[in-house]
Amino acid sequence: YPADYSHRNGNTIIAQHIYGYDSFLYKLVDKNSVAPQKKEISFNCGATTITGLVDYELSEDNVLLLDMAEHKIDGEEEFSPKEEILRLDNICRNKLGIEERGGAETQPWVYGEKAPISKAILRYTIESEIDYEGAILALEDAQKAEITFNSAKVDNTVIENYVDISIFKVALPKINKGVNELIITYPFGESASLESVFILGEFGVTVNGTKSVITALPEKIGFGDITTQGFPFYGGNLTYKIPVQVKNNCLNVVASDFMGTFIGAALDGKEIGKIAYPPYLAQAENIENGNHTLELTL
């Protein structure tokens, strides 16, 4: 678009607001062949600070991360104390005389699949403040694993992938209010690897130290750290649904303090812009005055 320019003492002067990350390329043409065009941000829309709790929407199920378990090798009677899963992998390898995994080990597909020599049995304790039906377990090697939940055998038929082509979803039975027990038995050997598993569903999660608890999904959330509001492990998109009142037929949305790739802004379901760089602004003009719903997707 034509720049806002003027001529003074034989010089061309360009007036331009410049923000962090901005860059401009100007094409200088013959004098008076293009009329100057002033482009300004309208600040006549009024201003209000949005606070408090608002409705929200998740783009996918919430997540309970299970990365610590008790374990035993097939043939052992007692489970060993709870430990972080990658350390457990090396503990199991040491018990079976297998070389430990490390940052420089050869990838398992280089030498092909090696037959398992035993089984690793992992036990997870899952605490819940609610009864919940419809949970999904996401794990690697789902079809090779034997899974029980609260002593009931779990059908390990794969529903679909989760996040990665090597992580699979299987349906879990009802999660009971109180303490639940998940046991996963994997064939184990030189080619095997133990990894974290995930429980997915429409529930909240609280974390206190190493203790995680399933809770009811929050009805509303506030602006700020979502990890303390029921979503410590959630990695999908989150949309804040904010009631706003439009005056002067315009709306400027400024959101400069966020952690994410960008914020998608929509008004009553219609996109009005993406907020990623200074001045962290999305604008809507020529809109009807009155009550609307602003949606900010992070």
Please provide the spans of the model-predicted regions.
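Short, exposed beta-strand/loop patches in secreted or surface proteins that constitute
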Residues: 3-7, 34, 47, 55-56
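Extracellular and analogous surface-interaction loops
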Residues: 118-135, 172-175, 240-251, 284-287
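Solvent-exposed beta-strand/loop surfaces of large extracellular or lumenal domains
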Residues: 1-14, 142-143, 147-168, 264-282
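Non-catalytic C-terminal accessory modules of carbohydrate-active enzymes
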Residues: 2, 18-19, 225-226, 233, ...
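C-terminal beta-strand-rich structural cap/linker in extracellular carbohydrate-active enzymes
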Residues: 10-38
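An acidic-aromatic loop/edge-strand motif
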Residues: 43-119, 141, 160-165, 170-243, ...
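Ordered hydrophobic segments in well-structured contexts
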Residues: 1, 23-29, 121-123, 136-138, ...
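Aromatic-lined ligand-binding clefts that engage carbohydrates, nucleic acids, or primary amines
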Residues: 126-150, 182, 244-269, 294-296
